[in-house]
């Protein structure tokens, strides 16, 4: 392929991604307008939850923090105040760390952890456990749904994350598993869903 063709392909990809992101901003403005109407009628502020895969390809993992930054800054600027995550390895961890980072710019926002059980980290590697403890220590609140693991506790955690949320920021590229379950549950509940998978290169 000639250098000119390669350059054109890169330009088209850049324009496509910018179009996707602009569409996302328009969607966020719609959420914000509805939120302002709710505020005027005495309703609550915007609540955002996260769902995403535990295992994420390295190339994707390298892009997620900057993409999350763009999306979450947009939501913060439009009034989002509460961010909920479920404390899992992978996307949940990336999202929680990004919210903690954004608290330096937006000190009024809150990170809330809704955790399936107290022994969630029992079989995790030590590095992941240390990161989990850091997030737990710096979150504004955390709640355990069960004292120890029981069948269905993960799904209950997923439902609790969505219930009461206005928008769900997801990374979902599969049709099965916990993330797909939460994604579908959010759609059925009428929650706005932003799938970061659709915004990646």
Per-segment meaning from a language model:
Residues 1-33:
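N-terminal amphipathic/basic-hydrophobic helices that include classical n-h-c signal peptides
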Residues 21-200:
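Acidic/glycine-enriched connector segments
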